């Protein structure tokens, strides 16, 4: 052993910087944005990331001789400049598939964004994108039902789904909460939603909410003749309680439940998605806490990665921002991760932030959910950006209507159908948005009042996290 093993510390780049390596189809590929400490060569920083996120440690160890390090190690195979940023660079790293447990997003993230993010040689580190190989994708369950099945279950075709979050999101009793749900659904919405932080608080225990909401949904269905639904948030203190809530929602014959996938965790989310698949339930996903992770342009995980991981872990709908509302997200970036939620193949396109080709095979797609600070004036832009396979959710833009939630729901429904009709007739709905909405308002006093109420409301703030393109 002494002839083959040299104790001590050697530079990471001696082992993990392999510029001649050609990635395999079965490799998991990752793109990191790296900002190293002053004086540390790029190759050493990039190799350190590859090492610490795969097989390496700070010292040479004798037990390397007990395995095939050349087979298992991560390899940094390319370094690129970041446009407009002299401090940072992109490091492209290939990981052999055998480093990861089959179907486990939890395991993938534990490796790629684990201890390496606290590495002293780095000032900042951001995971920009992942190329999941088909060999890994085939081990993941993915969306419990997917876009096509969800449309069939809800009997909604040819337009986006229309919904809203119940407001105020905290403080209502179960009965009053159910009353608001009923008003929204009878007014014309397809779906209503628990907010992310409604679980089972003293003012409203989860079982009361579920029962009153189920009553409201069924009454609205009887009155309108349409299929209605409400996202019942099953996020809970323990997995056991989460499944208990899901089972009760099923007993009440509710079509869809909800989970906060980042705060709840990927293990819980994958388990709940598997349960939904077996029990014929739809699963709505909220992304609470995402901005803590993805908003800093140099450190963390880009949301496109979190969106890809959700499609693999399982969810039928995912919040993606709005572009035009109150939440962060520019148009091209948002379209980039919407593509990865819905399409079967997404090509590399740096103008949309996609660093790799991504083949999703036959995995079902996920509805993109636009929610946060939107109202009727935004409807043409939302339809143009998100298309039909989306869910447009107006919280304040429903409940803030001067005539109440039912009128707000009616205004949104009329606005949506007017925009869809105009688009189908070949009109440029973004350029002609005012004419389309004002024309529809002639036949809808609810829409006319909504247009007047929100005519001055805009959220014109610059995006913090911008695409690195010139």
Swiss-Prot record:
Pfam families: RuBisCO_large (PF00016), RuBisCO_large_N (PF02788)
Positions bound to substrate: 115, 165, 169, 287, 319, 371
SUPFAM superfamilies associated with the record: RuBisCo, C-terminal domain, RuBisCO, large subunit, small (N-terminal) domain
Enzyme class: lyase
Alphabetical UniProt keywords: Bacterial microcompartment, Calvin cycle, Carbon dioxide fixation, Carboxysome, Lyase, Magnesium, Metal-binding, Monooxygenase, Oxidoreductase, Photorespiration, Photosynthesis
Enzymatic reactions: 2 (2R)-3-phosphoglycerate + 2 H(+) = D-ribulose 1,5-bisphosphate + CO2 + H2O; D-ribulose 1,5-bisphosphate + O2 = 2-phosphoglycolate + (2R)-3-phosphoglycerate + 2 H(+)
Protein transport in keyword set: no
Superkingdom, natural source: Bacteria
Gene3D superfamilies (UniProt xref): Ribulose bisphosphate carboxylase, large subunit, C-terminal domain, RuBisCO large subunit, N-terminal domain
Gene Ontology biological-process annotations: photorespiration; reductive pentose-phosphate cycle
Modification N6-carboxylysine occurs at: 193
Record has Magnesium as a keyword: yes
Alphabetized PANTHER family for the sequence: RIBULOSE BISPHOSPHATE CARBOXYLASE (PTHR42704), RIBULOSE BISPHOSPHATE CARBOXYLASE LARGE CHAIN (PTHR42704:SF17)
Function: RuBisCO catalyzes two reactions: the carboxylation of D-ribulose 1,5-bisphosphate, the primary event in carbon dioxide fixation, as well as the oxidative fragmentation of the pentose substrate in the photorespiration process. Both reactions occur simultaneously and in competition at the same active site.
Subunit-level organization: Heterohexadecamer of 8 large chains and 8 small chains.
Miscellaneous comment as given in the Swiss-Prot or TrEMBL entry: The basic functional RuBisCO is composed of a large chain homodimer in a 'head-to-tail' conformation. In form I RuBisCO this homodimer is arranged in a barrel-like tetramer with the small subunits forming a tetrameric 'cap' on each end of the 'barrel'.
Similarity-based family: Belongs to the RuBisCO large chain family. Type I subfamily.
UniProt protein name: Ribulose bisphosphate carboxylase large chain
Organism (species): Prochlorococcus marinus (strain SARG / CCMP1375 / SS120)
Gene (name only): cbbL
